């Protein structure tokens, strides 16, 4: 899900000079304090297994500082009770344009996806308007943009809704949706690409279909930034420089996890040599 879920120009010294680096007064010198969900795979967890954990490590490495997390389940009040309360200084994945925070430059762009069985009746499907969906059962996360597209296509009656805002320590709507797909309770699952892509990599019998052919509104593709407190301009410039210098490393991690990435023309990036 969109952490619905980026961007950082101070030049920092070498590792040998880390203790002498100047960091903005509003963030913690010597430590990158990241706000994160403790059970939100494939994005983050306390074991450091998510792709946002890996990206946080890249940022800390470039800054030559230690990495520390402040853990809180995502949901209403997440920004207020993390960044706002100054327990941490950076959210690794945040949709561009979202209010409440200041954003870095986007560091990747992704898209919502359909997930179907490779050998099933929907194999080769490319868009929601495909007539084969008319009599199929469609799993959809409530309140996400694809739900509006399905409504416009008259497919709401065919949908099985899954919750958007949950405590991922207790339940996982995405895993439930994929289980229902594998078990035959639904015929197609629709998920945010950075969530669906890594799940599909674990199931060879499933196919990920980026929704690249849908109408523009509401958007199906989103730019992801990093988020920080408003008015921390020096910190924003610092992180933007990190993102620029380590873009290739970040893209490599995202592709390794199976996150579908788009270039500026809306085409899929298939190697870490592609543009952000």
Stretches found by the model and what they are:
Residues 37-38, 109-121, 201-243, 257-276:
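Periplasmic-binding protein-like
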Residues 33, 38-42, 46-61, 114-173, ...:
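Bilobed "Venus flytrap"/periplasmic-binding protein-like clamshell domains
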Residues 64-66, 84-93, 135-137, 176-177, ...:
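Alpha-to-beta junction loops
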Residues 20-99, 168-171, 256-257:
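Extracytoplasmic small-molecule ligand-binding "clamshell" domains
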Residues 57, 61, 66-132, 143, ...:
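Acidic, polar ligand-binding/catalytic clefts
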Residues 22-24, 66, 145-165, 240-276:
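Ligand-binding clefts/hinges and TM-proximal coupling segments of bilobed small-molecule sensing domains
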Residues 2-14:
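Bacterial N-terminal signal peptides
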Residues 53, 57-61, 81, 85, ...:
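Solvent-exposed, polar/charged alpha-helical surfaces in well-ordered, non-transmembrane soluble domains
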């Amino acid at each position: 899900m969109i952490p619905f879920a980026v961007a950082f120009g101070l030049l920092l010294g070498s590792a040998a000079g880390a203790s002498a680096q100047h960091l903005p007064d509003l963030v913690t010198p010597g430590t990158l304090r990241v706000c994160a969900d403790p059970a939100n795979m494939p994005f983050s967890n306390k074991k450091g297994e998510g792709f946002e954990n890996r990206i946080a490590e890249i940022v800390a490495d470039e800054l030559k500082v230690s990495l520390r997390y402040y853990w809180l389940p995502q949901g209403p009040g997440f920004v207020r009770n993390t960044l706002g309360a100054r327990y941490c200084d950076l959210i690794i994945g945040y949709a561009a344009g979202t209010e409440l925070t200041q954003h870095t430059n986007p560091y990747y762009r992704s898209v919502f996806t359909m997930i179907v069985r490779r050998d099933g009746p929907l194999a080769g499907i490319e868009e929601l308007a495909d007539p084969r969906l008319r009599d199929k059962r469609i799993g959809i996360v409530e309140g996400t943009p694809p739900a509006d597209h399905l409504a416009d296509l008259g497919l709401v009656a065919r949908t099985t809704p899954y919750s958007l805002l949950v405590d991922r320590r207790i339940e996982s709507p995405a895993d439930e949706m994929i289980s229902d797909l594998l078990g035959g309770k639904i015929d197609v699952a629709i998920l945010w690409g950075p969530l669906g892509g890594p799940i599909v990599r674990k199931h060879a019998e499933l196919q990920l279909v980026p929704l690249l052919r849908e109408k523009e509104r509401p958007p199906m593709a989103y730019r992801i930034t990093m988020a920080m407190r408003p008015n921390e301009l020096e910190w924003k410039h610092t992180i933007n420089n990190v993102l620029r210098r380590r873009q290739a490393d970040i893209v490599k991690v995202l592709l390794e996890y199976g996150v579908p990435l788009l270039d500026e023309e809306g085409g899929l990036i298939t190697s870490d040599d592609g543009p952000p």
